[in-house]
């Protein structure tokens, strides 16, 4: 209640209920208490959910594969990489960071000691050949999808690529075939480079996998459309710069309109034939 300076103590006592507080803007009273109350009431399970900490044990060795190319930001790691490193450290495990070009040597030096390898999605094809089958392997993007509660939907969405691939095989050489429409969405508005994963690499991999020439639409930031009718598939980035509410809103929008939606890492893992392996750690450690 505001304007507490205008009411007496009896009025306050009669009108006070659970989780209520009296505030006076005039006298600056109760404002800090109000902020603390709002903070307590808005606690969500996101604050207790873990990116990777529930999948590893103290003392585990976790290798993080982070390619450094022209699309990587200068002088820093992107947010999911920072968050995974922090979560590994909070668990009491050890994070070893390397580029994909040094992964083979890193694994050789750590032979028999690595519990998990987390890779940037675009390096999946190379990394999968180097990581022993008895070592868990996943990606930052897949970890982010699980963290935001969207992994199940992302896995289902990735399998739409198989349907498109089948259509590509059936219509090979038939120019009358209708090109599928795919929306590729970025949560942030970074400056795109010549080898950008969302606008260059991912479309190229999809063309190669499906044998089709899909009609791609690219959006970023707040450009995500309200109406998704006409799209065969939505492929979203990991959404590290979007809060959980916004990501759920976008996922819900797709579900309400019966448009399958996946994310970069899940789609790339599926096209490389290692999606099942990328999910193995979740199926073994927790129920997704």
Where are these regions (language model features)?
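P-loop NTP-binding site
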Residues: 56, 60-288
């Amino acid at each position: 209640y505001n304007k507490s300076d205008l009411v007496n103590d009896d009025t306050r006592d009669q009108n006070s209920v659970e989780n209520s507080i009296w505030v006076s803007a005039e006298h600056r009273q109760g404002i800090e208490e109000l902020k603390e109350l709002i903070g307590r009431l808005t606690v969500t399970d996101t604050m207790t959910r873990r990116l990777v900490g529930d999948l590893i044990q103290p003392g585990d060795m976790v290798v993080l594969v982070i390619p450094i190319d022209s699309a990587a930001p200068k002088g820093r790691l992107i947010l999911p990489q920072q968050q995974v490193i922090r979560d590994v450290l909070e668990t009491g495990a050890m994070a070893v960071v390397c580029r994909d070009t040094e992964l083979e040597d890193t694994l050789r030096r750590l032979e028999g000691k690595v519990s998990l390898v987390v890779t940037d999605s675009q390096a999946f094809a190379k990394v999968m050949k180097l990581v022993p089958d008895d070592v868990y392997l996943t990606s930052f993007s897949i970890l982010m999808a699980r963290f935001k509660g969207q992994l199940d939907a992302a896995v289902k969405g990735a399998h739409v690529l198989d349907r498109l691939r089948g259509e590509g095989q059936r219509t090979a050489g038939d120019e009358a075939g209708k090109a599928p429409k795919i929306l590729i969405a970025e949560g942030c508005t970074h400056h795109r480079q010549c080898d950008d994963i969302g606008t260059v690499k991912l479309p190229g991999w999809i063309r190669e996998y499906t044998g089709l020439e899909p009609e791609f639409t690219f959006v970023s930031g707040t450009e995500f459309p309200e109406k998704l009718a006409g799209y065969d598939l939505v492929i979203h980035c990991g959404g590290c710069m979007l809060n959980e509410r916004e990501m759920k809103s976008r996922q819900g929008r797709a579900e309400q309109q019966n448009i399958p939606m996946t994310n970069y890492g899940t789609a790339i893992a599926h096209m490389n034939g290692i999606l099942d392996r990328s999910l193995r750690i979740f199926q073994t450690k927790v129920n997704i």
